[in-house]
């Protein structure tokens, strides 16, 4: 089995609620996602995704992912995607570092490996947990009232944890107090 085609797609992912960071100076309403589709000569198709925060927040950003994939693609064409370590070595040769750009390719290769083996990817990696884990919401509202409202909505939808980032440091104590009545103790995690 060999990688025969790599397709890259840019997708805007709108956020349900605006997310504020850096003391209310950065507002995110949409994330720049990159989807990678890897096809093989035997008809298998694997998908991977990279969705970092905006380029003003972390070095990883959507255009960087896409440029990195363009750089690495010639080095991994023709390789067996099930031999993930070989693919990783080829990516490292083409572009040292830049894990955020390699991750979507890695995911797509694992997707193909799981499909071709007929098992979930978790089984290929040593077995998944059958114990349910709580899912955390992520809240970055600008005011205490907005934070509480968004946390209440997530809680009503079944989220057992919430992580929040205060848009202004001065509201941190008030957000902590407001969130403790929405979520049980130790289930609210400030960033």
Where are these regions (language model features)?
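A generic structural signal for short
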Residues: 24, 97-99, 138-139, 168
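A common structural microfeature
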Residues: 33-35, 44-47, 102, 132, ...
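Metal-dependent enolase-superfamily TIM-barrel catalytic cores that perform enediolate-based chemistry
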Residues: 126-191
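Glycine-rich, aromatic-flanked loop segments that form ligand/cofactor-binding clefts
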Residues: 100-101, 106-142, 146
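Structured loop/turn residues at beta-strand edges in well-structured enzyme cores
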Residues: 1, 67, 103, 131, ...
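Metal- or metallocofactor-binding catalytic centers and their adjacent structured scaffolds
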Residues: 5, 39-116
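Structured beta-strand/loop patches that form or line metal/cofactor-binding pockets in enzymes
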Residues: 1-45, 51-56
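N-terminal amphipathic alpha-helix/helix-capping segment at the start of soluble metabolic enzymes
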Residues: 1-5, 9-11, 89-92, 114-115, ...
């Amino acid at each position: 089995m060999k990688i025969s085609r790599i397709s890259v797609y840019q997708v805007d992912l709108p956020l349900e609620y605006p997310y504020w960071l850096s003391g209310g100076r950065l507002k995110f309403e949409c994330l720049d996602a990159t989807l990678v589709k890897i096809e093989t000569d035997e008809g298998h198709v694997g998908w991977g995704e990279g969705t970092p925060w905006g380029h003003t927040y972390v070095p990883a950003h959507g255009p960087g992912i896409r440029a990195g994939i363009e750089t690495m693609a010639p080095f991994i064409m023709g390789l067996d995607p099930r031999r993930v370590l070989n693919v990783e070595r080829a990516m490292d040769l083409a572009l040292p570092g830049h894990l955020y750009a390699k991750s979507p390719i890695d995911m797509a290769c694992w997707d193909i490996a799981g499909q071709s083996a007929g098992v979930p990817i978790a089984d290929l990696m040593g077995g998944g947990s059958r114990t349910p884990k709580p899912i955390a919401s992520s809240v970055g509202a600008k005011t205490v009232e907005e934070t509480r409202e968004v946390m209440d909505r997530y809680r009503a939808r079944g989220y057992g944890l919430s992580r929040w980032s205060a848009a202004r440091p001065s509201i941190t104590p008030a957000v902590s107090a407001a969130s403790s009545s929405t979520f049980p103790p130790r289930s609210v995690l400030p960033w």
